[in-house]
Amino acid sequence: KIDDRVTFLNNLQKITSDVKFDIYGINKVQPIWADHYFKTIANCKMGLNLSRGKAIKYYSSDRITQIIGNGLVCLIDEKTKYQDFFSSEEMVFYKNLSDLSEKIQKISRDEKLRKKIGQKGKLKYMKYFNSNKVAQFIIEKTLGIKSKSFYLWSK
């Protein structure tokens, strides 16, 4: 079975040929793990948060934390509706392949903009989606405790 993300990434690279991509785990490039993974992602400028299958409202793998936590610009399909939590100054939302390509090209040429989006996204993510806040929410929901905390996703 062919993973639709492979086709998407191959097409993205074709139409965005002036930008360097580091893509692992496809096209005979071995995946990277552990320390090598974290060292590699720390040296990237942007991260594509691309999930398997169709985009689902509010769904993301933990990849989003790795991207944003390293201060990278997070590129995410607008169908995830993460715009409900983040502005375009904190995350980059794309409509389709060509829109994503255009946004990657723009950000790759504007270092100041890239750093600003990465930093703002990281600050907001760490404030509202950090592990303590998420764990507290799970505990309160599980035990039926009335929350005194503000959860961005409960608005």
Positions of predicted regions on the chain:
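Nucleotide-sugar donor-binding catalytic core of glycosyltransferases
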Residues: 1-88, 145
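A general structural signal for well-ordered secondary-structure junctions
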Residues: 18-19, 47, 91-92, 113-114, ...
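C-terminal amphipathic helix plus adjacent low-complexity
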Residues: 102-155
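An acidic- and aromatic-residue-enriched active-site/binding cleft used to recognize and process polar
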Residues: 53, 79, 96-97, 130-131
